[in-house]
Amino acid sequence: MPININKFILDMERFDGTLKKYPEDFIVEEITPEGTVLEVGKEIGFEDVEKWHGSFIHFTVEKTNWNTMDALKQIVRATKTKRKNFGFAGTKDKFAVTTQRFGCFGLKKEQLENINIKDIVIRDVQKTNKKLRMGGLWGNKFTIKIRDLNLSEKEIKRISDLKLDYVLNYYGIQRFGLIRPITHIVGKFIYERDFESAFYTYCGTPINETGDSLEARQLVDMGEFKKALKLFNRGHDYEKRLIQQYLKYKDFKMAFTALPPQLNSMFVNAYQAYLFNEMINKRFDYGFDELEGDILEDNTPTGTLIGYDTKFSGGIQGEIEKEIVERENLDLKKFKIEDFGNFYGTRRKMVTPIYDFKSRFENEIFELSFKLERGNYATIVTREFTGNLS
């Protein structure tokens, strides 16, 4: 089951290169709703609110080779508080240098300022009366280095002259799984209420794995759950939770209640994203200028994230959306999934602008910098040059 990322904006011969050779090659700096870039290594000096009610604190986390959730676990442990007391505006990947705002409830500034965790820096601690919510950011600034290039002077000149103003608004590989792109497959099984297949796909089905992880997944596929538990390591906490819950209740649906609700929602969201990516592919041949029947956002045609309350476009875009629904044999009402969430369906632009795009070659390194609005993927931009998603 592919992830449906097939088309390109740039008409060019793509080049091989190494992305993310070092964490410092992929810098992600969060941009606040007010447009402030949380620059790496820089104090911003956010001002405390004048009349603080003693509730909320926001702070910037700069981290190297930490994803958002693992960094948060360490911060929770260091402050001796609970995960539910914290929030963040957006998630960031691991193998990178990233900045982002976190929010917390019921802590003192000193508790945060005194934290000492390897490769994590906390700064810009600010007293506020506002809760930081998911999505509470404008977007991100990316600075990306692609190494190990072997290009002629002519090729360098050709690529340096390219200008990229917008990109196809695909959901990136991160939505489906970097190592094992199976999140959307699990989501489809959950939509179909085939929780047994969802369980085996997530815990078994080895892809690109070796050693204990490979053997553990093979044991799951053979039904040897207790043996598999002994081989899954600390990086497979969710697989272990699923198996333990299944062994306790002997019910595949009940097993998924051991996972965080956000993760269970992400499975179905990934299936919706997979279908959306296919809409982009089918619309590509018609172009992305406005056509009769389009539903627009910021004067840009949108596609639907299919859910129980989906409103179809008219015209050609509507035909594309309905064709996918019919081919997948979807019953929209089934996107109300007990214990997993109600996936009502929304709309998303099929192309998205790139802001402040710059590129340069230096010492056989191709460096890109640009800004994207929240919910958009930098690897879709780099893919335009390299053809690779990771």
Curated annotation (Swiss-Prot):
Catalytic activity: uridine(13) in tRNA = pseudouridine(13) in tRNA
Pfam families per UniProt: TruD
InterPro entries from the UniProt entry: PsdUridine_synth_cat_dom_sf (IPR020103), PsdUridine_synth_TruD (IPR001656), PsdUridine_synth_TruD_CS (IPR020119), PsdUridine_synth_TruD_insert (IPR011760), TruD_catalytic (IPR042214)
Active site (record annotation): 93 (nucleophile)
GO biological process: tRNA pseudouridine synthesis
Gene Ontology MF annotations: RNA binding; tRNA pseudouridine(13) synthase activity
Gene3D superfamilies, per the entry: TruD, catalytic domain (3.30.2350.20)
Domain TRUD per the UniProt entry, residue ranges: 166-353
Coiled coil residues, start to end: none
EC number: 5.4.99.27
Keywords, comma-separated and alphabetical: Isomerase, tRNA processing
Top-level division of the source organism's lineage: Archaea
PANTHER family linked: TRNA PSEUDOURIDINE SYNTHASE D, TRUD DOMAIN-CONTAINING PROTEIN
Biological role: Could be responsible for synthesis of pseudouridine from uracil-13 in transfer RNAs.
Family indicated by similarity: Belongs to the pseudouridine synthase TruD family.
Protein name: Probable tRNA pseudouridine synthase D 2
Taxonomic classification: Archaea, Methanobacteriati, Methanobacteriota, Methanomada group, Methanococci
Gene name for this UniProt entry: truD2
